Amino acid sequence: KITSKFGPRRRRMHNGIDVKVYIGDTIRSAFSGKVRVVKNQGRRVGYGKYVIIRHENGLETVYAHLSKQLVKEDQYVEAGEVIGLGGNTGRSTGSHLHFETRFLGQAINPALLFDFEKQDIVADSYLFMKGKNRYRRNNSSYASANGDVQYYKVRKGDSLSRISQKT
Protein backbone atom coordinates (compact mmCIF):
# COMPACT_ATOMS: atom_id res chain seq x y z
CA LYS A 1 0.00 0.00 0.00
CA ILE A 2 1.32 3.44 -0.97
CA THR A 3 1.22 5.74 2.07
CA SER A 4 2.79 8.84 0.49
CA LYS A 5 3.07 9.75 -3.18
CA PHE A 6 5.81 11.35 -5.26
CA GLY A 7 5.64 15.13 -5.53
CA PRO A 8 5.73 18.39 -3.58
CA ARG A 9 5.32 17.95 0.16
CA ARG A 10 5.12 20.91 2.52
CA ARG A 11 8.41 22.78 2.12
CA ARG A 12 10.23 20.37 -0.18
CA MET A 13 9.93 17.78 -2.90
CA HIS A 14 9.24 14.14 -1.98
CA ASN A 15 11.41 12.38 -4.57
CA GLY A 16 10.01 8.91 -4.03
CA ILE A 17 7.04 7.06 -2.69
CA ASP A 18 6.45 5.52 0.71
CA VAL A 19 5.26 1.92 0.84
CA LYS A 20 3.78 0.45 4.02
CA VAL A 21 6.02 -2.28 5.41
CA TYR A 22 6.54 -3.62 8.89
CA ILE A 23 9.85 -3.70 10.71
CA GLY A 24 11.66 -6.84 9.56
CA ASP A 25 9.71 -7.27 6.29
CA THR A 26 11.88 -8.49 3.41
CA ILE A 27 12.91 -5.78 0.92
CA ARG A 28 13.98 -6.97 -2.54
CA SER A 29 15.79 -5.35 -5.45
CA ALA A 30 13.47 -4.16 -8.22
CA PHE A 31 15.95 -5.10 -10.98
CA SER A 32 19.36 -6.71 -11.28
CA GLY A 33 22.28 -4.37 -10.70
CA LYS A 34 25.30 -3.32 -8.67
CA VAL A 35 24.97 -1.99 -5.14
CA ARG A 36 26.47 1.50 -5.27
CA VAL A 37 25.79 2.82 -1.75
CA VAL A 38 25.12 1.20 1.64
CA LYS A 39 24.95 3.88 4.33
CA ASN A 40 23.41 4.89 7.62
CA GLN A 41 22.64 8.58 8.04
CA GLY A 42 21.90 7.99 11.71
CA ARG A 43 18.93 8.21 14.02
CA ARG A 44 16.23 10.69 13.03
CA VAL A 45 18.29 12.03 10.11
CA GLY A 46 17.48 11.69 6.40
CA TYR A 47 17.14 8.20 4.98
CA GLY A 48 18.49 6.42 8.04
CA LYS A 49 19.80 3.07 6.80
CA TYR A 50 19.58 2.94 3.01
CA VAL A 51 20.78 1.16 -0.13
CA ILE A 52 21.22 2.53 -3.66
CA ILE A 53 21.45 0.12 -6.59
CA ARG A 54 22.51 1.09 -10.12
CA HIS A 55 20.90 -1.11 -12.73
CA GLU A 56 22.34 -2.05 -16.11
CA ASN A 57 20.16 0.47 -17.97
CA GLY A 58 21.46 3.39 -15.84
CA LEU A 59 18.39 3.58 -13.62
CA GLU A 60 19.07 3.81 -9.89
CA THR A 61 16.73 2.65 -7.15
CA VAL A 62 16.89 3.86 -3.55
CA TYR A 63 15.57 1.84 -0.60
CA ALA A 64 15.48 3.87 2.63
CA HIS A 65 14.49 3.65 6.32
CA LEU A 66 15.67 0.02 6.50
CA SER A 67 16.18 -1.68 9.86
CA LYS A 68 19.00 -3.76 8.38
CA GLN A 69 21.01 -3.73 5.15
CA LEU A 70 21.87 -7.20 3.88
CA VAL A 71 24.16 -6.23 0.97
CA LYS A 72 27.60 -4.64 0.58
CA GLU A 73 28.83 -1.91 -1.77
CA ASP A 74 29.95 -3.23 -5.19
CA GLN A 75 27.94 -6.43 -4.69
CA TYR A 76 25.93 -7.58 -7.73
CA VAL A 77 22.30 -8.43 -6.95
CA GLU A 78 19.67 -10.13 -9.06
CA ALA A 79 16.13 -8.82 -9.51
CA GLY A 80 14.08 -9.97 -6.51
CA GLU A 81 17.12 -10.65 -4.34
CA VAL A 82 16.76 -9.68 -0.67
CA ILE A 83 18.72 -6.48 0.04
CA GLY A 84 17.41 -5.42 3.43
CA LEU A 85 14.68 -5.45 6.05
CA GLY A 86 11.87 -2.93 6.46
CA GLY A 87 12.32 -0.40 9.22
CA ASN A 88 11.77 3.00 10.78
CA THR A 89 15.25 4.58 10.71
CA GLY A 90 16.22 8.13 9.88
CA ARG A 91 13.65 10.89 9.53
CA SER A 92 10.61 8.64 9.63
CA THR A 93 7.29 8.71 11.45
CA GLY A 94 6.57 4.99 11.27
CA SER A 95 7.76 1.83 9.59
CA HIS A 96 7.75 2.15 5.80
CA LEU A 97 9.99 1.81 2.76
CA HIS A 98 10.93 5.05 1.03
CA PHE A 99 11.49 3.99 -2.61
CA GLU A 100 13.03 6.26 -5.25
CA THR A 101 13.88 5.83 -8.90
CA ARG A 102 16.46 8.07 -10.57
CA PHE A 103 17.88 8.35 -14.04
CA LEU A 104 21.00 10.45 -14.67
CA GLY A 105 20.50 11.97 -11.22
CA GLN A 106 16.92 13.06 -11.91
CA ALA A 107 14.14 11.73 -9.72
CA ILE A 108 11.41 9.88 -11.61
CA ASN A 109 8.02 9.12 -10.13
CA PRO A 110 8.18 5.36 -9.38
CA ALA A 111 4.45 5.09 -10.18
CA LEU A 112 5.34 5.80 -13.84
CA LEU A 113 7.51 2.67 -13.84
CA PHE A 114 5.73 0.29 -11.47
CA ASP A 115 2.13 -0.74 -10.81
CA PHE A 116 2.36 -1.31 -7.08
CA GLU A 117 -1.12 -2.83 -6.73
CA LYS A 118 -0.42 -5.49 -9.39
CA GLN A 119 3.27 -5.73 -8.38
CA ASP A 120 4.39 -5.41 -11.98
CA ILE A 121 6.17 -2.97 -14.25
CA VAL A 122 4.06 -0.45 -16.18
CA ALA A 123 5.85 -0.93 -19.51
CA ASP A 124 8.28 -3.23 -21.26
CA SER A 125 10.55 -0.40 -22.36
CA TYR A 126 11.05 3.26 -21.55
CA LEU A 127 12.46 6.21 -23.46
CA PHE A 128 13.68 9.14 -21.37
CA MET A 129 14.28 12.47 -23.04
CA LYS A 130 14.84 15.90 -21.57
CA GLY A 131 11.44 17.11 -20.36
CA LYS A 132 9.61 14.03 -21.64
CA ASN A 133 9.05 10.55 -20.23
CA ARG A 134 7.81 7.90 -22.62
CA TYR A 135 7.10 4.24 -22.19
CA ARG A 136 6.08 1.29 -24.33
CA ARG A 137 3.99 -1.69 -23.31
CA ASN A 138 4.13 -4.98 -25.21
CA ASN A 139 5.76 -3.55 -28.36
CA SER A 140 2.92 -1.06 -28.93
CA SER A 141 3.69 2.55 -29.83
CA TYR A 142 5.34 4.88 -27.37
CA ALA A 143 2.97 6.79 -25.10
CA SER A 144 3.60 10.19 -23.62
CA ALA A 145 1.70 12.14 -21.00
CA ASN A 146 1.71 15.28 -23.14
CA GLY A 147 0.90 13.53 -26.44
CA ASP A 148 3.90 14.92 -28.34
CA VAL A 149 5.16 11.62 -29.73
CA GLN A 150 6.86 11.87 -33.12
CA TYR A 151 7.91 9.04 -35.39
CA TYR A 152 10.44 9.00 -38.19
CA LYS A 153 11.14 6.10 -40.51
CA VAL A 154 14.86 5.83 -41.21
CA ARG A 155 15.57 5.71 -44.94
CA LYS A 156 18.64 4.72 -46.93
CA GLY A 157 21.17 7.57 -46.91
CA ASP A 158 19.78 9.27 -43.77
CA SER A 159 22.28 10.69 -41.33
CA LEU A 160 21.74 11.50 -37.66
CA SER A 161 22.00 15.18 -38.55
CA ARG A 162 19.24 14.93 -41.17
CA ILE A 163 16.98 12.90 -38.87
CA SER A 164 17.40 15.37 -36.00
CA GLN A 165 16.36 18.27 -38.27
CA LYS A 166 13.15 16.48 -39.29
CA THR A 167 11.98 15.48 -35.81
Model regions and ranges:
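A structural signal for short beta-strand/turn segments enriched in small hydrophobics and glycine
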Residues: 2, 27, 33-35, 74-86
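Short glycine/threonine/proline-enriched tight-turn/helix- or strand-capping micro-motif at secondary-structure
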Residues: 3-29
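Non-catalytic extracellular/periplasmic "stalk"
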Residues: 1, 111, 121-144, 156
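Zn2+-dependent peptidoglycan hydrolase active-site motif and core
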Residues: 29-73, 95-100
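Primarily a LysM-type cell-wall glycan-binding module
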Residues: 10, 134-167
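Surface-exposed strand-loop junctions at beta-sheet edges and helix termini
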Residues: 21, 30, 71-72, 77, ...
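Short, surface-exposed secondary-structure boundary micro-motifs
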Residues: 38-40, 82, 87-88, 165
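Conserved, short, structured surface segments that act as functional micro-motifs
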Residues: 46-54, 75-131
